[in-house]
Amino acid sequence: MKLIDTHTHLYAPQFDSDRSELIHAAKMAGIQSVLLPNEDASSIPAIHALCEQEPDFAYPMMGLHPTSVDGDYINEMKKIEHALTRRKYYAIGEIGIDLYWDKQYCTEQKAAFETQLQWSLDLHLPVAIHMRDAFHETMDSIYKTGADRLKGVFHCFGGTTDEWNEISKLTAFYVGIGGIVTYKNNVLSETLKHIPIERIVLETDSPYLAPVPYRGKRNIPTYIIETAKKVADCYAIPVEKLAAITTRNSLELFAIPDKSIFDKKI
């Protein structure tokens, strides 16, 4: 069984003490690739270092996280834009609008988001969207920038069926399913009944949002298996089939190398 973790902060300081061991464990568990979303200019060196250490396993994104947007965001955006000229990236992310913690910089978040959406169009890259308490604002920016030309994933999706119905109109978008699907009384388990399996990818968002039975602990890429099992149950299919479909979806969206071809015997 092969899996792809489409969203992990494996470069973060929370993994400094045992990163190599966790990567080895992930590979042994069948995780063939991980995608690394950027946060701000300060996280760029760590992402690059991990991708250089694991060039056939870790694939970088580049973007400015909405909670890193403040009154000086334009200077931060210049650093992100410069980074995009320096090497290959597989998505613009993670980007979006987050009004959960603070609405002070809502205007700046929206401007940064729309600029980065345009970058994705210019560079022909997918986007990894962070959206929290900002569904309508996020969708407004997507339609304003070019909904018919954009592609990407709504990372850490936990929305309602009504929200999915709106997202479903964006035919080149997927939703990223993480550990919250394993939580008791979550809305997502019901929403999944309405989402075609061809429109989902799996993620951990590690070190955050660990799935049951690890909830409350540091999340790690290997725990994606627990999420895969739960999602497979929701679709009433074997987890191996779920893994194959979501891995194919991830490969199509992010255009990362398909490691499974190296597993085939000639």
Regions found by a protein language model. Name each.
Residues 1-266:
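Mid-domain alpha/beta scaffold segments of enzyme catalytic cores
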